[in-house]
A protein has these predicted regions:
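Metal-dependent active-site segment of extracytoplasmic phospho-/sulfohydrolases and closely related
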Residues: 148-173
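Extracellular loop and loop/strand-boundary signature of outer-membrane beta-barrel proteins
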Residues: 142-146
Length: 173
């Protein structure tokens, strides 16, 4: 999406679409607009060119500080399934970035924040209690989302330790 905020200036943003339904009416969800990492209008990485490098080598990716649209789920614009798809898509982007950096960094530190645990716990904690008022009329389909996530995050720690197979220091918080 191109925006023209002033003379001879264009700012580019990116969005993702999620098809909610086609009948009886077309319902299409659009994410909030992200800064295009291929042509960032503002610094979104350090060095500035790192965002462009990632976009060129891995494809465009989410750039908002809170990419997972918790408001859309809270306001029932999207359902839990759509939110999970969105959240895991963003997590997979970050994993690719992390392992790319880990692979290419011979000295120094590689730091990555995997905030999927925070997002999913905030949005799915209520599913642990079937009596929670927000669960009225719903099945227990999402009661294991948090547990499953932590199993997956444990596997991520294992893959990280394998990728850093030497005796380097690893810190997981």
């Amino acid at each position: 999406l191109d925006f023209k905020p002033g003379l001879a200036m264009t700012v580019t943003g990116i969005v993702r679409f999620y098809l909610i339904e086609t009948t009886p009416h077309l319902k299409l969800y659009m994410t909030p607009i992200n800064i295009d990492p291929d042509q960032p209008a503002l610094p979104i990485s350090h060095p500035f060119t790192y965002a462009i490098y990632l976009s060129k080598t891995q494809g465009r990716y989410s750039t908002l500080g809170l990419c997972e649209d918790t408001s859309a789920l809270n306001e029932e614009v999207i359902d839990e399934e759509a939110f999970l798809k969105q959240t895991y898509l963003i997590h997979e982007e970050r994993e690719r970035m992390f392992f790319d950096a880990l692979d290419k960094t011979s000295r120094g530190a590689v730091v990555c924040v995997f905030d999927i645990t925070d997002r999913l716990q905030h949005m799915f904690f209520r599913h642990l209690d079937q009596r929670h008022p927000a669960n009225r009329g719903r099945d227990g389909k999402h009661k294991d989302v948090i547990r499953t996530l932590y199993i997956e995050m444990d596997a991520l720690v294992g893959r990280t330790m394998e990728a850093a197979a030497d005796d380097d220091t690893a810190l997981f918080v």
